[in-house]
Amino acid sequence: DPANHPGKKILMSGGGRCNFTNPNSTPANFRSDNPHYCISALKRYTPQHFLDLVERHGIEHEEKAAGQLFCKDSSKEILSMLLTECEWAGAEVRLKTSVKTISGVDHGYQLQTSSGTLTCESLVIACGGLSIPTMGATGFGYDIAKQFGLAILPTRAGLVPFTLHPELKEQLAPLSGVSCPVDVH
């Protein structure tokens, strides 16, 4: 992870309380040019699997509208849980380390990183998307997928900012951090 702290996106999600899953999620809730991927992924690891993990770690949570599950306290609990699970699995988290190149080698992969060379039998790239560049989001995952000849589906905006005129922004500033249910038509 090139960041100096793990899980920055997790910590900001759900207004700092981490909207961590929704038991009502089905493949129909995901837009994709490859709907079979969503079916396959959600059958292998369901929202209930993640909820069971959260409960095993004793994280209190609450349901908001339409099945959205949030931590009662803080998204820090989800990050701590994930780091604990990594530790128990023997995974090593390397911060302030960026991957420069990845190449296929006999029986695995070789990574050139900012802190040296690593080799592994299998590799999972969890890099997010392009949604929040200020949080470190880049096109790295797409570049690696292209390098290994994987098909890339066209991307679409999933998270978009509201851009306001300066006068309106100033007028609405006192509402910062306030959320309410809305429908956009």
Predicted regions located by residue number:
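Short glycine-rich, polar/acidic loop-and-turn segments at beta strand-coil junctions
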Residues: 1-4, 24, 57-58, 97
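Predominantly flavin-linked oxidoreductase catalytic cores and closely associated redox partners
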Residues: 2, 12, 76-77, 81-185
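Short N-terminal binding/cap micro-motifs at the start of the first secondary-structure element
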Residues: 5-9
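Short, flexible micro-motifs
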Residues: 10, 17-19, 70, 131-132
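Short capping/connector residues at structural and topological boundaries
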Residues: 11, 15-17, 23-25, 35, ...
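Glycine-rich active-site loop/strand segments that organize a redox cofactor
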Residues: 15-65
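Flexible, glycine/proline-enriched loop segments at strand-loop-helix junctions
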Residues: 37-41, 68-73, 127-135
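An accessory alpha-helical subdomain
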Residues: 45-55, 65-89
